[in-house]
Swiss-Prot record:
Classification lineage: Bacteria, Pseudomonadati, Pseudomonadota, Gammaproteobacteria, Enterobacterales
One GO MF term attached to the UniProt entry: UDP-4-amino-4-deoxy-L-arabinose formyltransferase activity
Protein name per the record: Bifunctional polymyxin resistance protein ArnA
Site (Transition state stabilizer): N102
Positions that bind NAD(+): D347, D368, I369
Sequence similarity: In the N-terminal section; belongs to the Fmt family. UDP-L-Ara4N formyltransferase subfamily.
Sequence segments annotated as region (Dehydrogenase ArnADH): 314-660
Amino acid sequence: MKTVVFAYHDMGCLGIEALLAAGYEISAIFTHTDNPGEKAFYGSVARLAAERGIPVYAPDDVNHPLWVERIAQLSPDVIFSFYYRHLICDEILQLAPAGAFNLHGSLLTKYRGRAPLNWVLVNGETETGVTLHRMVTRADAGAIVAQLRVAIAPDDIAITLHHKLCHAARQLLEQTLPAIKHGNILEIAQRENEATCFGRRTPDDSFLEWHKPASVLHNMVRAVADPWPGAFSYVGNQKFTVWSSRVHPHASKAQPGSVISVAPLLIACGDGALEIVTGQASDGITMQGSQLAQTLGLVQGSRLNSQPACAARRRTRVLILGVNGFIGNHLTERLLREDHYEVYGLDIGSDAISRFLNHPHFHFVEGDISIHSEWIEYHVKKCDVVLPLVAIATPIEYTRNPLRVFELDFEENLRIIRYCVKYRKRIIFPSTSEVYGMCSDKYFDEDHSNLIVGPVNKPRWIYSVSKQLLDRVIWAYGEKEGLQFTLFRPFNWMGPRLDNLNAARIGSSRAITQLILNLVEGSPIKLIDGGKQKRCFTDIRDGIEALYRIIENAGNRCDGEIINIGNPENEASIEELGEMLLASFEKHPLRHHFPPFAGFRVVESSSYYGKGYQDVEHRKPSIRNAHRCLDWEPKIDMQETIDETLDFFLRTVDLTDKPS
């Protein structure tokens, strides 16, 4: 049975050995080049492949069409992935008639995502395991083929648990690979309501927060002990690593982080105390706790910190132009929920952000970006991150006011982009799913899909082309002048405060707001060209969480990236959206205040949008970049979004003159 293997780490090596022992013919192996900043304590898949005479590759992007074509030429019967670190696209997964299977280091459906070995220790679990499951587009979500449980002992650390999991994986593969080969497997669907998902960990995540219980800190030490980078803390500005520890049920009134004793080295925690058994100063060698205390100059009563004493306390300053808009006001709410952001905003109105106007870390000026150029330039210079969210983004305006769309969406934003270049500020720019135009790909991919628009005499494309050209300008500034940027492409975000019903009355709103207005007023729901066009609708909360992670930019992973933010699972036609909305409306507690439903009416796009309109039949995002850069995937079902959006708008209606 011919197979193509994607593999890395010890699990990759043992997976390859298991396949060969089971009689599989491995046509090619795909792996990664080693990261020079990572301690390589594990086996080399590349070396093993070379020793076994198997072709081995380490492409930067295995999902590139050229690699998809080369893998297709290998005609694999089955595909296996053993700890390969990138998501594999659906085009590759579909190449194998017998399917694709992944080995995951947890008991799915728990601990989907990255670093499950470390996360189970961080969270103090007493059991984990290994799972072989069928691969689907979503990470770790396919049906389970086989599992083995592994007990976690109280004295297990990351490396000992790693060895246990490797042993279990060998057993599991030895038992299961022959069954896959003969097509004799029983698959069990995962229960989505029980799933948990965890993101990538970085060395910076392992700081010891002394206000937490000693047991929690001890678990952190176990989770990242050598050969992982280790848990750490600071004495003043000097960093040190804790390699091993013990929990003491020490009753102390000392402040968390205070040194209770130096022999043994005992630190007060939020609950109990942590003994540092072995550790290492940043410029030293590993030593036992009391010697480390002497090296660091610790005495009873000394204080340890989670960050350097001189660490900057200043909040990150975020400039949001168009702060009163749909994305702007929800993003402001998310940023102000944290304690390390200062938000500066400009917009022509403030109705959606009135709830923030008295917040001490929110600063708002009412104004127009085409007039307040000096204010904008000053605040670009002053702030750390710039989000120019001002745009005309309603389809009817593309044909009704194409020049205004160009002037605002392109010309005004180009000026802001140039300010960011001038003052070397990071820009997070809202591209759009519209840039893909009439692309025929099943999934619209940021790095590979063609951007296809209609002829010049179809002005509906002026928005798409304006945004696309700005994307290209930003990319060029990044390449040639070092502009720090991220482009994000929202796919049909929905939720409360999307447009308003007054905008819908003049046709200048998005689809769901227009449909809600029809229900409120008792007018027919208009289905443009039958409403068969499909879109992938995304809850604003999912979208904002992804955007927040772009702003956070952990490990600078978002720099220079284009990221689709959408929900491929929430695909529906406009007609289906209308039917779901109607069902929600009919059972809403305020339903009796509104007129009877007036039915659906099919209208031609030219009569609704005017001359020069073209529509797009489907628009489904690939979200592999969002997985890779943000450890993000959408979670909220479309029906929940519809219910909450409808409820919000119905409660904004003045019911005094409505029938009861």
